[in-house]
């Protein structure tokens, strides 16, 4: 669709890249933005009074406003970070003080470990209960499961907006509305790392308390991410990472912290990453989420139908065949062939896919699976890529089939 915009393919023109859920490739505009900082700015934030440093700080302020507008937030609700994992861990540390042994933390069974382990460890540390919402066979959370699992002592609910295994999208506004009807006081945290690469986010409509996502899933660079937090939380919560740039007074008996976001951004940020994140957001806006969604659904439907038509009952699509509820990700199992063998042999043919548990062991173990093979699509993919994948998979099946 837009392969010419990605310099990666200048170096690897024959490669079929079907692993965008691990990290998306970077368009030239994003690469140029990072190089621009490194070559033309290369100064720190809020440290220097000379013009170049002030220009850098002003540009980061512009990108913070751009990021806020992108998800319908306020600039002071946007905290830059090294990625989704880092900020979810930081958030768990921040919320630790408010948690007691009488409380419960609830997560879904399809969470990435980044939105599972921090809450599991926090519950263990505070001797709180740790509960898991079990999803249906189609990857959603039922009202009955919410009612059975959420109780008055539920303090935190953590959910992924889009599973990195099944590709199934949650109806986030409806899900959060249902959670709030049962436990209106609970803090709701959403991992949107996969979702934001495929569909627009409106944090006001979602009504989550915190939302985290990474730049590198969004055609941006690695090492940069965002934590959105409602302003009424951020203005009262205490930081748990300390250093330069986040205090008004460090000398008194009690430290006086700056307002958000400064109080949560101690030390030097990944400034080149922030420049590039701004370019990635502009890139997505230039394409448009509607076009992106149509592209995603066309490819995943085509891939799913070709797998079933070609291999029949040997292939099981994880999360079902309702392509309208999933976006950008299609995982499957193949009877008699291990996903690692499939991925390794595909790799030797220049086709890049992911195999394993995808940092989502609870989901795999809960479904009796040791691994799955995952295809994940980007703007640079086409039906021709899927045809090449199917042809290669036919050859792998023939290679590994028992000989009579």
Label every model-predicted segment.
Residues 1-404:
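Pyridoxal 5′-phosphate
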């Amino acid at each position: 669709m837009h392969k010419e915009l990605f310099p990666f393919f200048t170096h690897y023109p024959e490669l079929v890249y079907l692993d965008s859920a691990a990290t998306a490739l970077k368009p030239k505009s994003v690469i140029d933005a990072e190089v621009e900082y490194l070559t033309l700015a290369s100064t720190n934030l809020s440290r220097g009074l000379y013009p170049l440093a002030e220009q850098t700080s002003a540009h980061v302020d512009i990108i913070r406003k751009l990021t806020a507008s992108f998800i319908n937030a306020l600039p002071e609700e946007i905290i830059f970070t090294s990625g989704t994992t880092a900020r979810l861990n930081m958030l768990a540390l921040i919320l630790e003080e408010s948690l007691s042994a009488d409380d419960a933390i609830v997560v879904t069974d399809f969470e990435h470990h980044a939105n599972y382990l921090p809450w599991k460890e926090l519950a263990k540390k505070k001797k709180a209960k740790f509960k898991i919402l079990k999803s249906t066979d189609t990857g959603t959370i039922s009202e009955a499961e919410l009612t059975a699992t959420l109780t008055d002592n539920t303090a935190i609910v953590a959910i992924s907006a889009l599973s990195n295994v099944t590709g199934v999208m949650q109806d986030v506004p409806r899900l959060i509305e249902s959670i709030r009807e049962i436990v209106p006081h609970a803090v709701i945290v959403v991992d949107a790392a996969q979702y934001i690469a495929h569909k627009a986010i409106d944090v006001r409509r979602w009504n989550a308390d915190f939302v985290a996502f990474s730049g590198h899933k969004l055609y941006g660079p690695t090492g940069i991410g965002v934590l959105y937090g409602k302003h009424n939380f951020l203005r009262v919560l205490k930081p748990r990472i300390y250093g330069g740039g986040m205090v008004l007074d460090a000398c008194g008996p009690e430290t006086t912290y700056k307002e958000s976001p400064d109080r949560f951004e101690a030390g030097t940020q990944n400034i080149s990453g922030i420049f590039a994140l701004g370019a990635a957001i502009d890139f997505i806006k230039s394409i448009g989420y509607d076009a992106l969604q149509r592209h995603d659904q066309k490819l995943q439907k085509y891939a799913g139908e070709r797998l079933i038509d070609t291999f029949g009952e040997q292939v099981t699509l994880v999360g079902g065949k309702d392509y309208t509820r999933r976006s950008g990700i299609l995982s499957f199992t193949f009877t008699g062939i291990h996903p690692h063998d499939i991925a390794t042999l595909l790799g030797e043919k220049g086709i890049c896919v992911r195999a394993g548990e995808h940092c989502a062991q609870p989901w795999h173990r809960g479904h009796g699976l040791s691994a799955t093979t995952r295809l994940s699509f980007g703007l640079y993919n086409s039906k021709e890529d899927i045809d090449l994948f199917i042809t290669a998979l036919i050859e792998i099946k023939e290679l590994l089939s028992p000989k009579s």
